[in-house]
């Protein structure tokens, strides 16, 4: 499992690796859990919610910034409204990632039209001042640039996976990533 990846059954082990059915006990448990949730089992829905909430929040937070909690909530609502449409339970985390990123980008774009309040709370690892500085620089990037930067550099997805998630061609991903990194470095002062 890569560093920073969700330690959850059925989650992909490598960046950009497509989710695929697993034959492990954890994979079978996840499949059974998803199938139970699809049949309306409230306990299974609650277990899935407990599994997905931190993962979806980790995806939405850096993209939607101050709207991260709202994006997380909207993504989880969309996931559970549409759980019955998920054909392959082993693909749960990839499917949830697509929904989370789309909701985060949507809310980030909507939030970009208004003046943003400073970010008060984002989970930080290590140096809190460094985390605050990174948040400040991320706030200066456009939602499209934040999304590409987070998916490539924080989530470790390849260009093809980012392209599929955002619904843009791979050359657009490369261009946005180049500009996002350049703007990040410029804002960082390095």
Regions found by a protein language model. Give the residues of each.
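Short, aromatic/basic-enriched loop-to-helix "N-cap" motif that marks the start
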Residues: 70, 84-98, 170
